[in-house]
Each structure stands twice: as structure tokens, then as C-alpha cells.
Amino acid sequence: MATPNNLTPTNCSWWPISALESDAAKPAEAPDAPEAASPAHWPRESLVLYHWTQSFSSQKVRLVIAEKGLVCEERDVSLPQSEHKEPWFMRLNLGEEVPVIIHRDNIISDYDQIIDYVERTFTGEHVVALMPEVGSLQHARVLQYRELLDALPMDAYTHGCILHPELTTDSMIPKYATAEIRRHLANATTDLMKLDHEEEPQLSEPYLSKQKKLMAKILEHDDVSYLKKILGELAMVLDQIEAELEKRKLENEGQKCELWLCGCAFTLADVLLGATLHRLKFLGLSKKYWEDGSRPNLQSFFERVQRRFAFRKVLGDIHTTLLSAVIPNAFRLVKRKPPSFFGASFLMGSLGGMGYFAYWYLKKKYI
């Protein structure tokens, strides 16, 4: 039985080798950057991560694992193909959420608990620590900015930028996503009313409740006045971070060290800030918030963090983010349900369906 912190002792011998028994479950390569840890110092038991490549929470967990230099066996759970609702995954997490990690006899299905567990469990002289020593000034700073950054309503930014592209500049979200999500919103009320009056044994009341809450949330995110309010609050958060980065420059003036948000050492706060800026740029908000020259320290930070090995490995080139999310799904769909013919025309048709997968991903679970 899961404990309140979502850490479940269990016999893990039953978990599937792969959702689709595809190449997606191959272990990730160990980083070769200077910050990578030595395999000799890792626990014998493997660390297994179930994630979706474009899930915001999954990305942050993967960045933490990569920055610490840990070997991790990654298993992709495709949200566009609803693999998070399949029985094998629901045995890991009834909440149908990614990420989930398995290590030793533990299943951990909460984003915050995963990060804390990885940082607490994988330690040693040759393992990178992302949390400064408890009681230090740097530790207090990391806790402060972790709370601040994790509180940002990324799902609201995402839905808002899809529904109101006029608020963005150079967004990497395809334009047809707006029309698609609006079409589904228009039909959602009718569809849910039908489900309420139909006898569908596979649809439980919790499921209907969850769908109604999702619809209500998206409708709230469609409110322009609400969006402008939270984007204004985002600007204040980024102002605070800009000022903090300026303090680091003044505190360490003349010293030969690379400056990060909480000091000279790269910490969890930098992981979270880097992931946040990457997502905001994808949504088309970077020109408004730092690329216009209004926050030069933030701009410098983003340029530096993108050059780190872990960020290149996990997030790749931001201009191919959407492409990297949807192409594997086309091939996995072909592998799961092979057609009677497999020619070039079918492959092109599969790739042509990338927009469909992109939309469903953006609608269902962007964080």
C-alpha cells in the first residue's frame, strides 16, 4: 500500500520490460560530461524511470538524473496514445501521472518526492549534489526558488498560449492546435452530458469527475483577463530572479567562478529555472520576458544553461522539440498496429499525423 508520500515498497519483479516492447526502453547512455558520476559508486539496483518526453515534470526529473550523472533505464509512456491509462501503468500509479520511478523495492509516483528521493539516495564523493549543505545560505536559497518556480501555473500558460496565440511571439506550437482544442471544448459539454446518461461500466464516476475538472480548467485558461493576470505575475517572478542573478554578480565580482542562481555551484534551483525558461520559449514568451533585453541576466543564464551536457541530452534543440515528441509516436503506432502494407506512402501518412499527436499531447498533459 502506498504511503502518504507516494513511496511504495513493493516486489517489482512483475513490471513490464516495455509498454510496447520497443527500442524505447533502452537504458540511457551515461553522460560523459565532467559532472558525470562514476558507475562504481552507483547502487547495484537499477533506477527505472517511466516518463513522457514532453511532460514538464518528466523533463525536470530527467534533468536532475542527468545532472547527477546517474545511469537510468528510461521507459517512454506515450500520453497521446493514452498509455498512462493502460492497466500495466496504472499498477504503478493509479493517478495516471508521469513521471514514476522504480528503485530497489520502491515505486515513487510524485514529482517532488522523486527529486527528493534521487538527491537523498544517490550521494557520495563522485556523485554530483544538487542540494547545498543543510543550514547553509545556499540551501535556503535553493528551497526558496524551488518553491517559487514549482508554483508557476505552467498548465495555464500552455493552454493560454494555445488558445490565444496573439499573446505569444514565435510560438513553436502549430496554429491548428488552437482550432482543434476549441473544437473539443465546444463538444466537451455535450459529450460529458451524454456520458452522464449512458450506462458505461468502464467509465467510473472519478473518471467523469476528472474530465469535468479538466474542461473547467481549460475554460478558465481561455479567459484572457485571467491569462493577463498570471502572465503579469510571471513577469514579477522573473524580475525577482533577474535581481537575484544581479546580486550573484556583485557578490562574486572579481572571482573566477561561473555564477548561477544561488551561488557559484549549479543547483536544483538552476535545473528548475532552466527547464522553466525552455518551456516559456517553446510557448512563444521568451521575446516578451527576456530576449527583448529587459532581463539581461536571465538571457545570459538561459544561454549558459542550454550549453550544459544534461540540458542538451534531455531537451535537445528547442526548435525540434515538437518534432521529437511526435515522430516516435508515428513509428510506435505503426509497430503496435502494423498495416497490411508498409510502403513509403504509409510512412509519409504516419508522419503527416504528427499534428494529431501533438495536439493530444498538448491537450492532455503538458506538465
Curated annotation (Swiss-Prot):
Coiled coil: none annotated. The keyword Coiled coil applies. Residues 45-126 form the GST N-terminal domain. CDD domains: GST_N_GDAP1. Keywords: Coiled coil. PROSITE patterns: GST_CTER, GST_NTER. It holds the Pfam family GST_N_2. Residues 174-341 form the GST C-terminal domain. InterPro entries: Glutathione-S-Trfase_C-like, Glutathione-S-Trfase_C_sf, Glutathione_S-Trfase_N, Thioredoxin-like_sf. One of its GO terms (cellular component) is mitochondrion. Transmembrane segments: none annotated. Belongs to the GST superfamily. This is Ganglioside-induced differentiation-associated protein 1-like 1. It comes from Homo sapiens (Human).
